[in-house]
From Swiss-Prot:
Localization annotation: Cell membrane
Pfam families: 7TM-7TMR_HD, 7TMR-HDED, HD
Taxonomic placement: Bacteria, Bacillati, Cyanobacteriota, Cyanophyceae, Synechococcales
GO cellular component: plasma membrane
Alphabetized InterPro entries for the sequence: HD/PDEase_dom (IPR003607), HD_domain (IPR006674), HDIG_dom (IPR006675), Metal-dep_PHydrolase_7TM_extra (IPR011624), Metal-dep_PHydrolase_7TM_intra (IPR011621), PgpH_phosphodiesterase (IPR052722)
This protein's name: Uncharacterized protein slr0104
Length: 811
């Protein structure tokens, strides 16, 4: 018996070695050759694990310090704003260009260029159309009001006739009663009293028949004028325009025709000369009065003046000719001479104790007297600033439980260094939005936003003079990309985000430029707007570049984006199709575990896409021997009963982890997805075969069974996502077996499993808190209830097929 036991132990040991050789640690690359095995040993060595963090930190600090502190490599000791330690004389005659002052002058010239204007034909046609509509409305009102004057002006003047037809019904009735019956006017208004005297004079010189005709004409005119007032009330026109139209009704026909033609001519003349935007009302009024001087009688003049002021108020037909303005500005810049600073031999450049000015610095630097050298203090300050930024970044990474690998450190270092480099070359072409979009897609929004703030600050420190419009524009666009990119699930959504990034970058640039250059706000739009559009297009271009380079970075640095995870979770992927075909029971088990884990991940705000994808691939290793797992036996004989050896059986079970890793590497699955294969089992005890072996050893009087041989080799879950999948995988079989149980029974079983995993220290490195376990348990039971919902039983008669017509029966 002891010999049999020794042989069994040897076989098991050999199988274990075979398994271990194909099951390296999850953070390493697959290896088959002896050289690769040596590399893996070095990679996993304690020395490398201890030395890597400080070495990588040092490389990152040196790289960023070298870029951010570039201006300290050759920095003048005698610069603008410093005191000269001694009096310095010009060694010879010299003249040097002041580049800084020259560039400032060029900016002033560009900003101060008076814009070229051009007449906009569309706006001109639109204003003429508005004029036609305005005059047509007056003509329609005059038509409704009828002929004016409606009585001979020798009898009543135009003003008196307009007053008579505009009387209200009550006032006219009082006046008519007085004229016809001699009834006195009660409390007559001044205008009624005036009309009373007028009719007294007419009655004295006019026959009753003529007076009756006059009254009839007045009533007709009042009726027609009432329609006019009703029309004006219906359209609810602007009160000022209404008054102008009523004023036009007071003119007789010939006078109105002359007034109308004058309005058209003056309006055309002003539009031909050009009407600029922003002209004030007093200035517009003076222009109109100048054109109308001594042309019309007083009342018609007032109608024309008011009409023109209303037609032209807040209107314009002159727009900026952007191309001509830009060319004019560039010509002015080219015509401008460089600002030069000159000095004669032995003349004093700066005296001892005097603060050096820009002009003096140009001379010192031109003569080579500015004492340029490496500013070690500046470099040390830069290194301290970079080190502090890295500490903050690492602290945030640990805070959100986002462990980073060596290749992650390298990628983040390269991305972070690229931005200050581009800022130094030209702030216009900085790639802050691109690195934010990539970091957010690979590592989440928190790290992306942290990186944007820190790298943006370092880039600002790297520049000798901060160009705020470029820095703030790119930073705002980068923050937008960092917040949103990790939530997008398709290339189309990322492309739309790129448009938003470009628009944000251009808009923030424009407003920052306006704030910084507020002194030239009247003409700044014409020079800043084209630059803002170009800068916005650059933001779009960086986003497109980030989207395009993302798949290559995913492969090169073994990182994933949400889009990549969605693609991997597609059931049409070759590996998932193989799993569904070769191990259908395992595939169904995987789907149920995915439902459990995904729901829990969503509840705990974990990476749902990663959990879904990792769960779908966590048991692919079972394809190496599908019948070795009960879910694939479909009610057939149990393979392990035929083997009847717990050591062989446990090696078959454990091998699904090592073989799964081999398959995952062969199909190019990312590391974060491969991590689910070993970590979902952790170092759990395969208790069924352990107890079987233990009982067999006790019956045979053999030495105690080594428990480690019946445990998975691990590692235990290293993230919240793999920890959730471990719990879901452990509970799946137990919940599936509960068909008629109530939720309380299911909850009790889930809690027992959770406590067993917690006490076995399987979750200690996962980041899951003990207080979160009841939340996960509640989610699991809720999903179980959804799967095992009750359905009504169909009556037997409903299942019987009744043939009504042979011709309609199909088999």
């Amino acid at each position: 018996m002891k010999a049999i036991f020794a042989l069994r132990q040897a076989v098991a040991s050999q199988l274990k070695k075979s398994t271990a050789s194909s099951h390296p640690l999850p953070r390493t690359t697959a290896s088959t050759s002896q050289d690769e095995t040596i590399w893996q040993k070095i990679h996993r060595s304690r020395f490398v694990r201890i030395a890597h963090p400080p070495v990588m930190l040092g490389i990152t600090v040196v790289s960023l310090t070298g870029v951010v502190g570039y201006r300290f490599y050759n920095q003048p000791q005698l610069s603008v704003g410093t005191e000269s330690p001694y009096t310095i004389y010009a060694p010879e005659d010299g003249s040097f260009v002041d580049e800084r002052t020259t560039e400032e002058k060029r900016k002033e010239v560009r900003a101060g260029t008076i814009p070229r204007l051009q007449r906009d034909n569309e706006l001109t046609a639109q204003l003429k159309q508005e004029r036609s509509q305005y005059l047509d409305a007056i003509n329609q009102l005059r038509y409704l009001a009828g002929t004016f004057p409606y009585i001979d002006t020798k009898i009543f003047t135009l003003e008196q006739q307009h007053l008579l037809r505009s009387l209200g019904p009550g006032e006219w009735q009082q006046l008519e009663d007085y004229i016809s019956y001699g009834q006195p006017l009660p409390m007559a208004s001044p205008q009624l009293a005036k009309l009373q005297q007028l009719f007294d004079q007419q009655k004295a010189t006019t026959s009753p028949e003529t007076m009756a005709g006059l009254l009839t004409s007045i009533r007709t005119a009042q009726d027609r004028y009432g329609r006019v007032t009703a029309r004006l009330a219906e359209v609810k026109a602007d009160r000022q325009i209404t008054n102008n139209q009523i004023g036009a009704l007071k003119l007789d026909g010939p006078t109105w025709q002359t007034t109308q033609q004058t309005i058209i001519q003056v309006h055309d003349r002003i539009l031909t000369q050009g009407l600029p935007a922003g002209i004030t009302a007093p200035l517009l009024g003076e222009t109109v009065q100048l054109h109308l001087r001594n042309i019309l009688p007083p009342q018609a003049h007032q109608v024309a003046e008011n009409s023109l002021n209303n037609l032209l108020k807040d209107k314009y037909n002159l727009t900026v000719d952007k191309e001509a303005t830009k060319n004019l500005a560039e010509k002015a810049v080219l015509a401008m001479e460089n600002v030069k600073v000159s000095a004669e031999k032995n003349s004093v450049i700066v005296r001892a104790g005097e603060v050096i000015t820009q002009e003096q610095f140009v001379l010192l630097d031109g003569y080579g007297l500015s004492q340029r050298q490496v500013n070690w203090q500046g470099l040390l300050r830069t290194a301290g600033l970079v080190g502090g930024a890295l500490i903050i970044f690492c602290g945030v990474s640990r805070r959100i439980h986002r462990p980073l690998r060596r290749r992650d450190h390298i990628l983040l270092c390269l991305l972070s260094v690229s931005t200050p480099v581009l800022f130094l070359l030209d702030p216009v072409y900085n790639n802050l939005p691109a690195i934010s979009l990539l970091t957010s897609s690979f590592y989440g929004p928190t790290l992306a936003i942290t990186q944007v703030v820190l790298v943006g600050g370092l880039s600002a420190f790297a520049m000798e003079s901060i160009v705020w419009e470029y820095l703030l524009g790119s930073a705002a666009a980068a923050l937008l990309a960092g917040m949103i990119a990790s939530k997008l699930r398709s290339r189309d959504e990322l492309a739309l985000l790129g448009v938003g990034v470009g628009a944000t970058q251009g808009i923030v640039y424009l407003f920052t430029y306006l704030i910084v250059n507020a002194s030239a706000v009247t003409i700044i739009w014409y020079t800043a707007l084209p630059s803002a559009i170009v800068y916005g297009l650059l933001g779009l271009a960086w986003s497109a570049m980030a989207i395009g380079v993302s798949p290559y970075l995913e492969r090169l640095f073994d990182v994933v984006t949400p889009t990549r995870l969605v693609e991997l979770s597609n059931p049409n992927c070759p590996l998932l199709q193989r799993l569904a075909k070769e191990a259908p029971g395992t595939f169904q088990h995987t789907l149920f575990v995915a439902c459990l884990a995904e729901s829990a991940a969503r509840e705990l705000r974990c990476n749902v896409e990663l959990v879904r994808t990792g769960t779908l691939y966590h048991d692919i290793g079972k394809m190496h021997d599908p019948l070795g797992f009960i879910e694939n036996q479909m009610g057939g004989p149990n393979k392990h009963d035929e083997i009847n050896d717990p050591y062989v059986s446990v090696d078959i079970i454990k091998k699904h982890v090592s073989e799964g890793l081999v398959m995952a590497r062969r199909y190019g699955l990312p590391q974060v997805v491969r991590d689910f294969i070993p970590e979902h089992q952790g170092q759990m005890l395969i208790s069924y075969f352990y107890i079987q072996a233990k009982e067999a050893a006790e019956r045979a009087g053999e030495p105690p069974v080594n428990e480690e041989e019946f445990r998975y080799t691990g590692p235990i879950p290293q993230s919240r996502e793999t920890g959730i999948v471990m719990l879901a995988d452990s509970c799946e079989a137990a919940l599936r077996s509960l068909r008629e149980a109530n939720p309380e029974t299911a909850m009790a079983m889930v809690n027992r499993i959770f406590k067993a995993r917690w006490r076995d220290n399987q979750l200690q490195d996962s980041g899951l808190k003990y207080e979160e376990l009841p939340i996960i348990a509640d989610v699991f039971v809720r999903v179980w209830q959804q799967f095992h919902h009750q359905r009504i039983a169909y009556p037997k008669a409903a299942l019987d097929v009744q043939v009504t017509s042979p011709s309609t029966t199909r088999f």
